[in-house]
Amino acid sequence: MIPGNRMLMVVLLCQVLLGGATHASLIPETGKKKVAEIQGHAGGRRSGQSHELLRDFEATLLQMFGLRRRPQPSKSAVIPDYMRDLYRLQSGEEEEEEQIQGIGLEYPERPASRANTVRSFHHEEHLENIPGTSENSAFRFLFNLSIPENQVISTAELRDFREQVDQGPDWERGFHRINIYEVMKPPAEAVPGHLITRLLDTRLVHHNVTRWETFDVSPAVLRWTREKQPNYGLAIEVTHLHQTRTHQGQHVRISRSLPQGSGDWAQLRPLLVTFGHDGRGHALTRHRRAKRSPKHHPQRARKKNKNCRRHSLYVDFSDVGWNDWIVAPPGYQAFYCHGDCPFPLADHLNSTNHAIVQTLVNSVNSSIPKACCVPTELSAISMLYLDEYDKVVLKNYQEMVVEGCGCR
């Protein structure tokens, strides 16, 4: 049996989507009739038909979120700290900002200004040493990119963790160079001992700093996604300017060390991050806003006030069974609009001229309906979740929160 609170939550979500004319296209007229049927079943027996209707509406909501099916994340799925921190910055959680800045996270203003979706991909564990490179300091590693067809990638970044070098007589004044390449042909087709690559990005860094380094790999990812060229992976090369062979490549983390726990390594693995847009809504933009109201937030009763206004509606993703794949937020305050639009319409009811005329006509001819209480302003929320392929996604969803109501 499906819990009654889950069914009721789906009903409430559907009511929000059906609450205003701007959302009428999200659910067809036949769907509106089904809402009434579900409401009739919610307080009584749960028939097989009600379960079918629940599945239909869950599918509708998943489609609204741009998902073909409900994600079923594996227990081994890892949420990179970078994606959590990016979500906190995007959602404007100010109390976390100092901590985020402390680990050296830089918000990617330029990529995000053209994207409404951020995806992250860990590299496959198998690494190939590239023969013929100086001191065997170059490795090839692969990323399995699963990106929807409607997603247009604008920018891609490779993040590698670099540890401080504290060995050798010259470490305080030493530097090393990190080069990132795209592998143009598979090793089987290359001349023995020489891999065909092209340089994507390079950086000269000091030995005595521990931090993440970010490299622009957009040309390679755009070739793989837009031009549908084969993906033969990336190569990383580390060369030291003032250090012996003994210390070559020991501090740029591309593989797990033997004494290291799997949990620590999961957060230090190389991470490929793509910034894209699916043509829906607006781009991700960094902003600060007040935190959404908590789930149980008492409101003062407004006696004798039945006019159109905004009411509390907290959507808890655990109530609809989605908390296993939605990482953050655990829920959000969606609000809804409800109330009368009496004649004459007061200024605070945020009415249009047409609504004023319609209400005036209704006062003398009851066959003409009153103006309706509907959302007049809506805002977006950011969601961090695991998709159907266990990839971590940060996405901006438009028109999810009612900011204002009015008679229209």
Curated annotation (Swiss-Prot):
Family annotation (SUPFAM superfamilies): Cystine-knot cytokines
Disulfide bonds: C308-C373, C337-C405, C341-C407
Principal location: secreted
Modified residues annotated as Phosphoserine in this record: S91
Protein's UniProt keywords contain Signal: yes
Propeptide stretch(es), residue numbers: 20-292
InterPro entries: BMP4_TGF_beta-like, Cystine-knot_cytokine, TGF-b_C, TGF-b_propeptide, TGF-beta-rel, TGFb_CS
Gene3D superfamilies linked to this entry: 2.60.120.970, Cystine-knot cytokines
Pfam families associated with the record: TGF_beta, TGFb_propeptide
Function statement: Growth factor of the TGF-beta superfamily that plays essential roles in many developmental processes, including neurogenesis, vascular development, angiogenesis and osteogenesis. Acts in concert with PTHLH/PTHRP to stimulate ductal outgrowth during embryonic mammary development and to inhibit hair follicle induction. Initiates the canonical BMP signaling cascade by associating with type I receptor BMPR1A and type II receptor BMPR2. Once all three components are bound together in a complex at the cell surface, BMPR2 phosphorylates and activates BMPR1A.
Membership in a protein family: Belongs to the TGF-beta family.
Name of the protein in its database record: Bone morphogenetic protein 4
Organism per entry: Dama dama
